[in-house]
Amino acid sequence: MGYTHVELLPVMEHPLDASWGYQVTGYYAPTSRYGTPDDFMYFMDYMHSQGIGVILDWVPAHFPRDAHGLACFDGTCVYEHQDPRKGSHPHWGTLIYNYGRPEVSNFLIANALFWTDKYHADGIRMDAVASMLYLDYGKQDGEWVANIYGGNENLEAVEFLKHLSSVFHGRKDGAVLIAEESTAWPQVTGKPEDGGLGFDFKWNMGWMNDFTSYMRCDPYFRKYNYGELTFSMLYAYSENFVLVFSHDEVVHGKGSMIGKMPGETLEKKAQNLRAAYGFMTGHPGKKLLFMGQDFAQVDEWNENASLEWNLLEYPVHQQTQDYVKALNHLYRTHPALYEMDYDPEGFQWINCSYDQDSMVIFIRRSKKADETLLFVCNFDNMAHEKFRLGVPFAGKYKEILNSDAEEFGGTGMTNPRVKTSKAMEWDELENSIEIRVAPMSCCVFSCTPTEEEKAQKNRKGTKTSAAKTAEASKASENSGAEKKEENAARKTGVRTVKDKVRKLAEKKDELGKKAVQTVESVQKLASEKVEKLTTRKTEPEKLATKKVEAEKLTTKKVEPEKLSTKKVEVEKLSTKKVEAEKLTTKKVEPAKLSTKKVEPEKLTAKKAEPEKDFGKNDDEDK
């Protein structure tokens, strides 16, 4: 089948069959259900002789309450907490280890090392890590006690996991630690010295839930759930993930993998399942598939019954198994599918916006520049006879696997001929090819660049290598110079002090320059502000001047009014003069009358001597 490892459900001794081995009582004993300890050693050796590694499921998160187990081991709470809010797990009805006790921590760490030392296990997969990390896991308010900081993190369990990983990897025997952690706890696969828990891999439960939900949809409605297909790549490099379809997904009424697929017939369901497995193989991360799902077992897994091996007599199941076998061999023979699982340079979207067509196109790369695979996954029930897509470089593209091949139960809508790229821009790439895409299918192409493209890649690779070498040599030279200086300083005991004094002097000069610059800038700002204030001050003065001028104009306006008053008085005098003329009997020259200022009283007093009076008046006028 081409598998590289097998992961066994817990083989430690346990009393309850229905627990599947997850309620362990004999941590240091292989279960007697399958034979003796020697039989188990033989099994491990045989698997290794066939090139298959063995990973064991291990349960340090909780243990059963059975009296013949670890509960109240000596009549007191030795392994568990005395306070039931800390030591009881209501979700499973089991007890929780007191990880803060050194005796308990050492017991569990020694047990993990026991299985790698005595039985040569290639890895340990830890169950229910999330229940260890959170004090309130599976509990209601009032059923748990906060940590010393008032939070829900189990600080003692966190330290236990870090200590375990440090000791485990300190053996340097190549064994790996895998965490089944279903929350967003950060740095599960980070190094303990960097604040991580120290695991090598983490199950990607988020991808499993999203992708399973997407595949359950009818193909017509998948375009509305396109995000469930592509979302995982947003966090794919936050941890070292393993993509899993485990036993938890095919029990408790969830149905088998083929049972989750839409389709009116078993063949249609198998068509969807093949596309799903193809996408899983191309997606970054290690892969895990539960037994029976590689030949499309119809029923859920039942711990009380064997797998339905008889189904292999039917073509659809045999063809599904052949397809999974082909995928596994493709995985093992192409480093692009595993070498750069946790390096963003190993993956590139060609197009992840075909939501209306329910398609994704991407490439996988290896550490070698010429190792590239192109994946085209169609989750829609529509076929594309001439589908153009962008390719990463000019070259030849050969289809090496197609889930719609007749040998796997498909319709045979494949691409038997090698495709040569054309210099036609597509998907924002300079080159493109045209292929046939079957409905519900996944096809994989090997990519061979042209000689010119190879030369360009080699030149780029040479430049990159040269740059890296130069940086390394420069760093080495700097390191060597620093070491020489350190040695000289150690010998003389003076150079270090001089360097410090010199550096302090340089810093002092720099600070002095900065201070001068700061003072100058402050002075400049102050002068600018003074100028602005002066300008603002002159403006009121101008306004005052304008106000005075306005007052003068108002005064001038008043003077004409005075003149008008005088004019009225003259008019009154003229009226009186006319009246005086009427009183006189003599004729008077108009010119003389108009210029005289006559007093009416004098004119009327001497009526008998008019000539004398008028002559006198004439002299006064002159």
Regions found by a protein language model. Give the residues of each.
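Conserved, mostly hydrophobic/aromatic
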Residues: 8, 27, 47, 108, ...
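Long, intrinsically disordered low-complexity tandem-repeat segments
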Residues: 503-504, 524-608, 613
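Conserved alpha/beta catalytic core and glycan-binding cleft of carbohydrate-active enzymes
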Residues: 120-122, 137-303, 311, 332-389, ...
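Short, flexible loop/turn elements at secondary-structure junctions
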Residues: 12, 31, 60, 130, ...
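Alpha-helical packing segments of well-folded alpha/beta enzyme cores
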Residues: 1, 39, 43, 104-115, ...
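Substrate-binding/active-site clefts of carbohydrate-active enzymes
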Residues: 1-153
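Carbohydrate-interacting/catalytic domains
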Residues: 1-2, 267-270, 281-289, 293-511, ...
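Short glycine/proline-rich turn/loop motifs
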Residues: 24-27, 88-100, 144-145, 251-263, ...
